[in-house]
């Protein structure tokens, strides 16, 4: 979000649900905006947001949700995909690097972007899914702030990748400082003001994909 695409897919998903009356337009939009502002400030409670954003997934049959998601991707996300981001992903693929998307956005929403970029490793917040239905609960730790580091470390261990030479990490958000500090090649992409200053202080590379 705001790195490979010019926008936030979690926020856009909420807007899409509102615009198509899958949720109560007024109350859901207000809360969606509130949570997004908290995210930008770095004060978001990810578990609270999970309960809010996963609840609509419990209302519909899974196949209906898949249809909604497909329309959402084509209408909302596809126009936000950055050509330079596609070039960057292809550069790493051609370099035989192992790619992963690490995102606070839940896996149901972020999977369509991962599929578009043909990146098979997706580390995301996981909505609980039991007997073919979403329960509205969070499964495991949120993939947010320090939680991203935990998920990346587990992914490295589980995929026998501990002998890596470098880990490149691209992000726009100061919420990802912990993961930037963990990785050997942190790169700020069109960073927010806070991350921009931190990147300058740490002499981290800053690029634009816009």
Whereabouts are the PLM-identified features?
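Active-site neighborhood of HAD-like aspartate-dependent phosphohydrolases
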Residues: 1-41
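Catalytic cores of transferase enzymes with a strong primary signal for eukaryotic protein kinases
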Residues: 7, 18, 45, 63-65, ...
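Conserved active-site and cofactor/substrate-binding residues in soluble primary-metabolism enzymes
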Residues: 8, 60, 147
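Amphipathic alpha-helical segments within well-ordered protein domains
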Residues: 14-15, 54, 184
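Short, compositionally biased "basic patch" segments
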Residues: 36-63, 122, 126
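C-terminal cap/substrate-recognition subdomain and adjoining C-terminal extension
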Residues: 67-70, 74-210
């Amino acid at each position: 979000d705001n790195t490979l695409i010019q926008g936030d897919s979690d926020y856009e998903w909420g807007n899409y649900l509102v615009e198509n009356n899958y949720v109560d337009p007024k109350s859901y939009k207000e809360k969606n905006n509130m949570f997004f502002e908290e995210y930008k400030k770095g004060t978001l409670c990810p578990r609270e947001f999970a309960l809010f954003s996963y609840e609509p997934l419990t209302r519909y049959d899974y196949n209906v949700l898949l249809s909604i998601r497909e329309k959402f991707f084509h209408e909302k996300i596809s126009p936000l995909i950055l050509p330079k981001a596609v070039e960057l992903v292809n550069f790493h693929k051609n370099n035989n690097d192992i790619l992963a998307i690490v995102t606070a956005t839940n896996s149901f929403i972020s999977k369509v972007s991962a599929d578009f970029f043909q990146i098979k490793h997706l580390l995301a917040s996981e909505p609980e899914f039991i007997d073919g239905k979403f329960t509205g609960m969070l499964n495991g730790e949120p993939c947010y702030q320090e939680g991203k580091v935990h998920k990346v470390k587990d992914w490295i261990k589980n995929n026998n990748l501990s002998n890596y030479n470098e880990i490149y990490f691209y992000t726009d958000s100061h919420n990802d400082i912990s993961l930037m500090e963990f990785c050997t090649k942190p790169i700020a992409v069109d960073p927010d003001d806070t991350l921009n200053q931190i990147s300058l202080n740490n002499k981290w590379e800053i690029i634009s994909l816009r």
